[in-house]
Amino acid sequence: MLACNDDTSLYLLVKQVTKKEIYSNDLENGNVKRGASTHSLYLIGDPKFCRNNSSKQKSIIILCGPTASGKSYLGHELAKAYNGEIINIDSMQVYKEIPIITASPPKSYKTEILYHLYNFLSMTEDFSVIKYLKLATEKIKEITDRGKLPILIGGTGLYINSLVFGYNNIPDISEDLQAQVRNLHVKIGNIELWGKLEKFDPLAASKINQNDTQRLIRAYEVFMQTGKSIFSFQTLPKEQILSDFNCKIIFLNPERKFLYKTCDERLDKIFKEGAIDEIALIKKQFAPKDYTNLKAVGIKEILAYLNGNLTLDEALNAAQIRTRQYAKRQVTWFKNQIQDKITLEYANQEEFTQTLKNSFKTI
């Protein structure tokens, strides 16, 4: 096993098993392409992946990609190989009530590697990207102080963008004000709250859809707390989180046909392995205001099934369609927004898994 610390270069790869050479420009660009004669995945030992031994920077990996692309498996294997610990960067996997519908890492993984910021928060608690970033920063420091490698895994673009490019440090909202605004929202609903926001902060109202409950409440809270538009904070210098780290971003980009297949299979598995009971329990224990705005794909469809508006097959089919649409949007976002990344392309999960295992045998 290879430990990773300030003085250790990371090299992912290792084994080339096709007859076709990987093109030199792919190596230069830090990309991994499939050879013409096979669909195997290659992880390349790119010297750019980490700085050389003279670097004083600590290393960090961000492993991103669409849902159902194999991030959890690859991240777990990397953590085992490079003495790492894993930090969640998925906005829905923070909630402890929905580990099944969000496909959180299995318990077996957590017995081998330390996992952080998964399933720790009640969905009734207020949470924001700023709160996430503060927690993630603390975990990154704790992990590097132990001489280990932080590996951040997820597909939430807002969180990843804020980690990589910095964030606008909006003042904390008091708990009393949060409670007041949420009670107001329950009483008057989205449209009237949006109307109030328009009076106080027309700029925010012009940019926020009336149906976007989370952003609407957030903008109203910020104005009530600060007297300023939430968008005014975007003109200030951004707080940087990873500027002291040698950060490498690995983007998993399966072929679309295969990605859609894995999306469908994941939803089918989730529905069969407890997601229905998970959402039924939430429906029983919590008020609708606590769960109707959760964005995890499948919750809306299962609620429709539980309310008698869809059959189980219809709910599953609707969830699969929405998952494929979400995965497509994620791929587009990562391609366009994150430029400096290592892209891994593959067309078959079995070959991806086997090649990965073969690669780590040679380290």
Curated annotation (Swiss-Prot):
Function: Catalyzes the transfer of a dimethylallyl group onto the adenine at position 37 in tRNAs that read codons beginning with uridine, leading to the formation of N6-(dimethylallyl)adenosine (i(6)A).
UniProt record similarity statement: Belongs to the IPP transferase family.
Cross-referenced HAMAP family: IPP_trans
Binding-site list for ATP: 65-72
GO MF annotation terms: ATP binding; tRNA dimethylallyltransferase activity
Reaction equation(s) it catalyzes: adenosine(37) in tRNA + dimethylallyl diphosphate = N(6)-dimethylallyladenosine(37) in tRNA + diphosphate
Cofactor: Mg(2+)
Oligomeric and partner information: Monomer.
InterPro entries: Dimethylallyltransferase, IPT, P-loop_NTPase
Name of this protein: tRNA dimethylallyltransferase
Signal sequence extent: none
Entries under Pfam families matching the protein: IPPT
Annotated gene: miaA
EC number(s) given by UniProt: 2.5.1.75
